């Protein structure tokens, strides 16, 4: 008997919605990364995108433990000399709710074409509303 290998046409991608209110950033990110990769499914195949679509609402209400809201720093660089900017978690959440969660999940996914396809299945919204009701996402508790 040979090893099972999922075919891309046979994979069913389900939709899930996660309410991130008062959840810890890293715990949500690790569970989301696992589900985007499809490792929770019995048909998981490393070279095939077997993951599900994840919609995260209330990302503006995410928490971090300890003093990380001030100590955790996110860096960007414009490409010009001296063009580095630093932003802490609190300021990033105030300006772009959900950006910290997107960066955390992206760091947990594989790099390359398959990983880039996986991150496109993540939809993050700062408020309680999302435009994906037509897909009938199931509630997922973390």
From Swiss-Prot:
InterPro entries: Ribosomal_uL13, Ribosomal_uL13_bac-type, Ribosomal_uL13_sf. One of its GO terms (biological process) is negative regulation of translation. It comes from the Bacteria. It holds the Pfam family Ribosomal_L13. One of its GO terms (molecular function) is mRNA binding. GO terms for cellular component: cytosolic large ribosomal subunit. CDD domains: Ribosomal_L13. Keywords: Ribonucleoprotein, Ribosomal protein. Part of the 50S ribosomal subunit. NCBIfam families: rplM_bact. This protein is one of the early assembly proteins of the 50S ribosomal subunit, although it is not seen to bind rRNA by itself. It is important during the early stages of 50S assembly. Belongs to the universal ribosomal protein uL13 family. This is Large ribosomal subunit protein uL13. It comes from Paracidovorax citrulli (strain AAC00-1) (Acidovorax citrulli). The gene is rplM.
